[in-house]
A protein has these predicted regions:
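Catalytic loop of the DD-peptidase/beta-lactamase superfamily, centered on the K-T-G motif
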Residues: 1-174
Length: 174
């Protein structure tokens, strides 16, 4: 698997560079808990465990990485940011995508009023375009509340799946 700053999906893991060090990450898919673990090149590891499901623990994990790497604790490690533009083929992304890890979860995408919107893990969200087929998933009521990053995979002009961190959602509405 390649080593690069942008995360690379590695069969359930994500691998990337942070401040020149290789990081391998995984998040848990168990109902009722949120977990994220990472191995940092140099023999370090860290894990965040939360007893509430579908909670974004990224920022806490980043604090751990920053401490290990000697970076300012508030340093963010998002690899995609909204660019203010609109995706040219929104109709290709519309649909119901499902992941079947433990309890099935859905990522439902709709094109409404000139915006990609929908439901992600039972939350009302908007999808803000970052470039290529990558979107920031944000809370519909508060766009400063980043929930996840989505990368859609297209074939023949239609999304067959979407990756949200280390989870792959496949089109359910064939």
């Amino acid at each position: 698997f390649p080593v690069q700053e942008r995360p690379y999906y590695c069969l359930g893991l994500e691998k990337r560079l942070i401040d020149g060090k290789i990081i391998c990450e995984h998040s848990g898919g168990l109902h009722g808990v949120s977990t994220k673990g990472g191995l940092v090149e140099g023999g370090y590891s860290c894990a965040v465990l939360c007893n509430e499901g579908d909670v974004d623990v990224n920022e806490f994990q980043w604090i751990c990485y920053n401490f290990i790497l000697g970076l300012p604790l508030e340093t963010t490690h998002r690899w995609a940011e909204p660019n203010g533009r609109t995706f040219s083929m929104p109709e290709a992304l519309q649909g119901d995508f499902m992941a079947k890890e433990g309890v099935p979860s859905h990522c439902i995408v709709r094109w409404e009023n000139g915006m990609l919107t929908g439901t992600y893990c039972d939350r009302q969200v908007d999808f803000l375009y970052c470039g290529k087929t990558v979107f920031a998933i944000v809370d519909k009521a508060d766009h400063t509340n980043r929930i996840n990053t989505a990368e859609f995979y297209l074939k023949d002009g239609r999304a067959w799946g979407v990756r949200c961190y280390t989870r792959i959602y496949q089109r359910a509405d064939l």
